[in-house]
Amino acid sequence: MALSKRELFQKRRLRNRNKMRKMANGRARLSVHRSNKNISVQLIDDLNGVTLASASSLEPSLGVVGKNNVEASAKIGEAIAERAKKAGVEECYFDRGGFLFHGRVKALADAAREGGLKF
C-alpha cells in the first residue's frame, strides 16, 4: 500500500533528524518550519535546549507579513544569518524537517549562506 503524504513527510523528517544527530558535534541546529501562509526558522542549541535566534514571516520589522513567496523566504534567511552572528554562531547544521529542499526552503538556506552562516 502506498504511503500518504503525511507518512512520507514523517519518514523524511525522522531520517533527516537521525542523520543530523550523528553529525551534530555540538553545533547549533537551524530548524525550518514552513506552512501554507508563513515560514519560520530557529537557531537552536540542542545541548542546552535553548533557542539562540529566530526569524519569521510574522515579524512586522522584516516587512514580509502576509507574503508567502521565495523573496520573503530570502529576507528571512538574511535576517537569521544576521541574528546568528549577533549570537556568536558561525557554523550550524540545516534541519529542513520533512520539507523538500526546493523553493522557499532552498531560498531561505541560500540567503542564510550568503549572509555568512556555514552549513
UniProtKB/Swiss-Prot annotation:
Keyword rRNA-binding part of the UniProt annotation: yes
SUPFAM superfamilies: Translational machinery components
GO BP terms in the entry: translation
Pfam family, one: Ribosomal_L18p
Molecular function, one GO term: 5S rRNA binding
GO cellular component, as recorded: cytosolic large ribosomal subunit
Keyword flag Mitochondrion: no
Alphabetic keyword roster: Ribonucleoprotein, Ribosomal protein, RNA-binding, rRNA-binding
Source domain of life: Bacteria
HAMAP family, per database record: Ribosomal_uL18_B
Subunit structure: Part of the 50S ribosomal subunit; part of the 5S rRNA/L5/L18/L25 subcomplex. Contacts the 5S and 23S rRNAs.
Cited function: This is one of the proteins that bind and probably mediate the attachment of the 5S RNA into the large ribosomal subunit, where it forms part of the central protuberance.
Stated family: Belongs to the universal ribosomal protein uL18 family.
Record protein name field: Large ribosomal subunit protein uL18
Species of origin: Jannaschia sp. (strain CCS1)
Gene field: rplR
